[in-house]
């Protein structure tokens, strides 16, 4: 195997969430009397978490005196409307099923708020993915390395019997040293410039997927080890 661990972005990588995000944004815009946004504008707004999404969507952003009201309205509405049109991309469920059958360590690392992540992992993926790190409002968001490193720490606990998880236990290797040791064995899969920067900042390899929210022409300019056009292409690449 070329990699021991696979990490996935969520929106635009595993799930097509664009329409539900757009509908939720525009619900808030209409409720507050602001202009609505076309789907393609929302596509460009996503990637840095829902607060940044709403900063970009709300006139004057955080300078708007009603911004916090708009943001709270979005969070409440989206939490109960995040599975209307949201679907896994073709081939994603088969890929996750195959990896689960192989007991392949995998995790989700996303800027989506943790509450929504937990709901989607439970309802869409039926908890096939055992570790999912979202935005908890405390830890730095992607493209910082912190979410990736948190996912790796949790995977080490979940897969404590693996040789790579046990590495350093006997000789008291520090957690920081273990993270640096494991990173060459990790692949991060995403669909955007944020994901490429996350992988680079985290010191792990990046696979980019062309079926997501960004144009392939942009993806080709970003640092990556492979550009995927179908989810199942990932299996062959990871196997080497």
State what each model feature region is.
Residues 125-134, 219-234:
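Structural recognition of alpha->loop->beta junctions
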Residues 143-196:
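Conserved Lys-Pro-Asp/Glu-containing loop-to-beta segment of HAD-superfamily phosphomonoesterases
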Residues 188-227:
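Acidic, Mg2+-coordinating phosphoryl-transfer loop and its flanking beta/alpha structural elements
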